[in-house]
């Protein structure tokens, strides 16, 4: 509907355009049964190469995200004695560095998820802000948006610091700032995130997410 010619490559599994009646993990090999094609890991890495730019964008999640859009899926706390051990980088380093842009979607919004600095950078955002990403030798692009249960956030063009793009209906500016571990940039009164249309909801409920997985993740 929004992107009729979209190609979906199912993460580390390498499945292209799997057609399922319910959502599975991107690494679940059940996806291969309905996929148009499949790529092994070496071919996946070749497609991510910045000279090819096969991937227009990636959609990722994380344990932590910081004010410059760096993400962490590895550990929470000291790497030697972590409080939480995550799934690892699972290709995120390559996608954040070499896809044209990426989007971060989180199922929670609190100070443990929105950190001044992530405990471990496994996906490079705007690093220390400003032009630090380009100075590190990474191609331009990086994080475009962060979406949480409280709002939508983008990055100020010069400083590359996270700012409020919109707040979800019923969410106050104070509420989102209190739930964030750093000061979010804000210009004026943030607009309210638009409600999905009836057509969009119908598509989600009858084609994309028949079993209501998203409703359980985002109550």
Each PLM stretch: what is its role?
Residues 6-14, 106:
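Short internal beta-strands
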């Amino acid at each position: 509907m929004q992107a009729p010619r979209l190609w979906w490559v199912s993460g580390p599994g390498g499945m292209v355009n799997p057609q399922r009646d319910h959502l599975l993990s991107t690494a679940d090999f059940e996806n291969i049964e309905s996929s148009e094609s499949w790529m092994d890991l070496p071919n996946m890495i070749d497609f991510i190469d910045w000279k090819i730019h096969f991937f227009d964008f990636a959609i990722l999640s994380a344990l932590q995200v910081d004010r410059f859009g760096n993400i962490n899926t590895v550990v929470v706390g000291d790497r030697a004695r972590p409080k939480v051990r995550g799934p690892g980088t699972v290709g995120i380093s390559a996608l954040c560095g070499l896809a044209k842009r990426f989007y971060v979607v989180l199922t929670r919004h609190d100070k443990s998820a929105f950190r001044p600095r992530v405990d471990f950078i496994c996906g490079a955002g705007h690093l220390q802000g400003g032009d630090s990403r380009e100075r590190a030798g990474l191609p331009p692009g990086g994080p475009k948006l962060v979406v949480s249960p409280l709002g939508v956030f983008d990055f100020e063009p010069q400083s590359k610091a996270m700012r409020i793009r919109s707040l979800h209906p019923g969410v106050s500016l104070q509420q989102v700032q209190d739930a964030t571990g750093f000061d979010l940039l804000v210009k004026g009164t943030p607009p309210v995130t638009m409600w999905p249309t009836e057509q969009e909801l119908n598509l989600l409920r009858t084609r994309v997410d028949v079993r209501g997985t998203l409703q359980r993740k985002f109550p």
